[in-house]
């Protein structure tokens, strides 16, 4: 959010929040600090890259003598914010055709981010039924790792990334922690059949 200050050249009693033209977001917390100074909070639209623009057109309010304002096109009568409130997402894929792992099997996982990130790390990944190794940043949007199922186990291997684990260059944290493409599940059977005991001669 950003706090905006509207400074009038003369006192006015009829300058109100509705006099401000707002795109790409909304105003709140409108406050008359004095008859010439007003403040408000600008909040950009969620999940958007549309610039936020706040301005006041001419003839929106008047001074004590009844003269209406006339600087609707002046440069200091408009503020523009570059906005990026789009939260990055992630998709996880694997190289195993049937998602079934036996003793000695491993699978290469690929984590594909919708936006570049510099703080996505292995510890952001939630793992059960096995472990990750060989973490590799192929690029700022693609990461790979090797999943190894737990030995002597029939517990499914599950790999996922929860929301709010990493962020993009604008500081937006990731979302879609519960999306279907944000989790991979392996059927695991790494139990081994014991070798038969030799028969007595």
Place the predicted regions along the sequence by residue.
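Non-catalytic beta-sheet/beta-sandwich ligand-binding modules that flank or precede catalytic cores
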Residues: 1-201
């Amino acid at each position: 959010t950003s706090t905006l200050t509207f400074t009038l050249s003369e006192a006015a009693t009829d300058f109100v929040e509705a006099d401000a033209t707002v795109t790409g977001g909304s105003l709140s917390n409108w406050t008359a600090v004095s008859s010439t100074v007003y403040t408000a909070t600008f909040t950009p639209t969620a999940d958007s890259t549309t610039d936020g623009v706040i301005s006041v057109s001419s003839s929106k309010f008047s001074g004590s003598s009844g003269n209406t304002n006339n600087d609707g096109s002046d440069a200091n009568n408009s503020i523009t914010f570059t906005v990026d409130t789009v939260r990055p997402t992630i998709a996880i894929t694997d190289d195993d055709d049937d998602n079934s792992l036996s003793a000695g099997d491993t699978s290469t996982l690929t984590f594909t981010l919708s936006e570049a990130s510099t703080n996505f790390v292995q510890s952001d990944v939630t793992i059960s039924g096995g472990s990750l190794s060989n973490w590799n940043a192929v690029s700022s949007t693609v990461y790979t790792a090797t999943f190894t199922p737990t030995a002597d186990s029939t517990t499914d291997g599950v790999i996922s990334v929860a929301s709010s684990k990493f962020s993009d260059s604008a500081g937006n944290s990731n979302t879609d922690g519960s999306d279907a493409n944000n989790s991979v599940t392996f059927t695991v059977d790494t139990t081994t059949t014991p070798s038969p005991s030799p028969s007595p001669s």
